């Protein structure tokens, strides 16, 4: 049976997205929800696995780790890129590396939750509410304010659209800023 290790699944998200039971006839899965003590510990615990499903850049896939996993054939990372994977080492060892599609919506949503929380003093207001007080601060209005973005790719453009919906002036900077995208989104290049 093909052995698959799911690494660094601290939040148990792998089981929310994949029905591991459905795949259990062909694959044997083991979920590692805690970080490894060190690289030697990782080598010892991962020695029998043919595939590693890695969450983000939590466990570095170094040359030493890759070289010492003799059965390793595949590394699949969440998202399209993972800078913690030594691609030269995987290439030399003929380990196939691939990523998953990314869902761009959570990042702009979290970005706006944080912006709104800061603008409206959520932390202070929640703390005060627990002490019996109500509306102890005055937040700031976003309409008319300037929102600066670094990058106007898939995530940045979503953040920009929401900023425009709040009536904000949006500015963006990037080394490879696309002026057509700026015009399309009504964003000022910086």
Predicted regions located by residue number:
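N-terminal glycine-/charge-rich "phosphate-binding" loop or analogous flexible N-terminal tail
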Residues: 1-51, 55-56
